[in-house]
Design a protein with these regions (language model features):
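Helix-loop-helix connectors at the membrane interface of multi-pass transporters/channels
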Residues: 1-12, 107, 124, 181-209, ...
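Hydrophobic, membrane-embedded alpha-helices of multi-pass small-molecule transporters
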Residues: 16-23, 55-61, 72-137, 162-182
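Transmembrane alpha-helical segments of multi-pass small-molecule transport proteins
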Residues: 2-29, 44-53, 87-102, 166-171, ...
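Membrane-interface loop-to-helix entry segments
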Residues: 15-59, 69, 119-123, 233-241
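Membrane-water interface regions at transmembrane-helix termini and the short interhelical loops
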Residues: 19-42, 101-111, 187-196, 217-229
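Hydrophobic alpha-helical segments and their helix-loop junctions in multi-pass secondary transporters
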Residues: 45-72, 94, 134-143, 245-257
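TM-loop-TM module centered on a large, flexible mid-protein loop between adjacent transmembrane helices
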Residues: 133-180, 198-199, 215-225, 231-238
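Inter-helical loop and helix-membrane interface segments of multi-pass membrane transporters/permeases
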Residues: 1-18, 25, 29-32, 60-85, ...
């Protein structure tokens, strides 16, 4: 009814992409207060729903036994390390952008203790739990459906209940929305606003970021998972690692952890 689509994607997929893009921009235009509200309730909601999915996977796969009995796909440690090391580097690159711009969020902390706990305890713990649940669910799909399903959209398509599908898709939207805005929009929006404060506001910076995001054609990156991980993520992690090294050396060695607060706000 909507045509055959273009660039390898259906018309409905393009409409979904544009609607989601517009939702991101709308939240940014409402400011940091709405963003903070979204982040505060999105994380526990997604955690609860993912835990429910883990419970389903555990029951459908008849417990942990079949999951732990699965054999490794690697013949030896040499083949394992060839995949593990670049994959680990890719994940470091994935989080490098947020780590460099963490002050965009920690500045709202009411004390050093709050931001320290958030970065050293809360963030690593929640990411480990989410990653572990993702591995568990994907492993369970191998037992349940005979093949690993890592894409939550494809997994949801296996369900029969319209209610379950609706709740699951809403959870996917909330999870993607909260992560995308916090990790990919806030920091560059602040960068544009701070670079040209007379001409660009935070809202305008968010709009510029959204336009650049479309021009980068992210659907091409995701079309090839191997290229996305081993070329894109591993490639730019080297550049961001260098920037991170400069920031660490400047703060700990050059400035001895002492900053002039007035200099931080000069434009």
């Amino acid at each position: 009814m909507l045509g055959g689509g273009f660039l390898g994607h259906t018309t409905t997929e393009w409409l979904s992409f544009l609607l989601f893009w517009g939702l991101n921009i709308a939240i940014i235009y409402k400011g940091m207060n709405l963003l903070r509200l979204v982040e505060n309730w999105a994380a526990p909601f997604v955690l609860v729903m993912t835990a429910a999915l883990v419970g389903w996977a555990y029951d459908a796969a008849d417990g942990m036994g079949p999951l732990l009995a699965q054999k490794s796909r690697f013949a030896d440690f040499d083949s394992f390390w060839k995949v593990f090391v670049p994959s680990l580097t890719g994940m470091v690159g994935f989080w490098a952008t947020l780590s460099l711009n963490m002050p965009d969020f920690t500045r709202f902390g009411r004390s050093q203790r709050e931001q320290a706990i958030g970065q050293t305890v809360a963030l690593p713990t929640t990411m480990f739990v989410f990653a572990a649940m993702g591995v568990f669910i994907t492993s369970a799909t191998t037992v349940i459906y005979g093949q690993p399903i890592w894409d939550p959209i494809k997994l949801v398509a296996k369900f029969d209940s319209p209610v379950v599908i609706a709740i699951s898709m809403f959870t996917v939207v909330v999870a993607t929305l909260s992560v995308n805005i916090a990790a990919n929009v806030v920091s560059p929006a602040n960068d544009f606003a701070n670079a040209f404060p007379r001409f660009i506001s935070f809202k305008t910076g968010g709009l510029i970021t959204g336009i650049l995001g479309i021009l980068m054609q992210p659907w091409r990156l995701l079309a090839d998972p191997s290229g996305y991980i081993f070329t894109w993520l591993v490639g730019y992690s080297g550049g961001l690692g260098s920037i991170g090294g400069v920031l660490i050396a400047d703060y700990w060695i050059v400035r001895r952890t002492r900053l002039n607060l007035e200099d931080l706000y000069l434009t």
